[in-house]
Amino acid sequence: MIALIDYKAGNLNSVAKAFEKIGAINFIAKNPKDLQKADKLLLPGVGSFKEAMKNLKELGFIEALKEQVLVQKKPILGICLGMQLFLERGYEGGVCEGLGFIEGEVVKFEEDLNLKIPHMGWNELEILKQVPLYQGIDNKSDFYFVHSFYVKCKDEFVSAKAQYGHKFVASLQKDHIFATQFHPEKSQNLGLKLLENFARL
């Protein structure tokens, strides 16, 4: 059973509907105790890094997540802002500490790229590692992105990259911790396949 963490950061319903389409049992976790009854966790999110961390703290999710992920070793998937929160720090609205599951930081796309910010739309993945999330998904497949910030971290954690002015991290994996910068719930059949792969872990 997959807990979708509700910390007032959007796109929960679309993720829940995507899991329903593939027959994966899920529920909305509205408080930290709810995480105990799940065998997998999902941290969605759209919006500001700083505001999201503030909400997680106020709702009591930060310590609960660290317990469930780092001690209990439950698989977790972070989507978009959810992925970014896994890092040590972000710079949206000033320096802000993240969950620290993965070493690295979250920075904004440079303004001088002559590209529209946010990066919005379909983009091709360069899959670098055959991780469980990409089982049955071909390299150069397209997924849907909406973001103004991107992750900088060690290559050892990067499972895929995409290109927008320069190459950036499209997905991460560190042991049982998985994350995508793109939105699988908005990425049609391939996105459903990725969510199915996570549900089957």
UniProtKB/Swiss-Prot annotation:
Pathway: Amino-acid biosynthesis; L-histidine biosynthesis; L-histidine from 5-phospho-alpha-D-ribose 1-diphosphate: step 5/9
Residues of the Glutamine amidotransferase type-1 domain: 1-201
CDD domains named in the record: GATase1_IGP_Synthase
One GO CC annotation: cytoplasm
Keyword Metal-binding applies: no
Reactions listed under catalytic activity: 5-[(5-phospho-1-deoxy-D-ribulos-1-ylimino)methylamino]-1-(5-phospho-beta-D-ribosyl)imidazole-4-carboxamide + L-glutamine = D-erythro-1-(imidazol-4-yl)glycerol 3-phosphate + 5-amino-1-(5-phospho-beta-D-ribosyl)imidazole-4-carboxamide + L-glutamate + H(+); L-glutamine + H2O = L-glutamate + NH4(+)
Protein name, entry field: Imidazole glycerol phosphate synthase subunit HisH 1
Lineage start: Bacteria, Pseudomonadati, Campylobacterota, Epsilonproteobacteria, Campylobacterales
Gene: hisH1
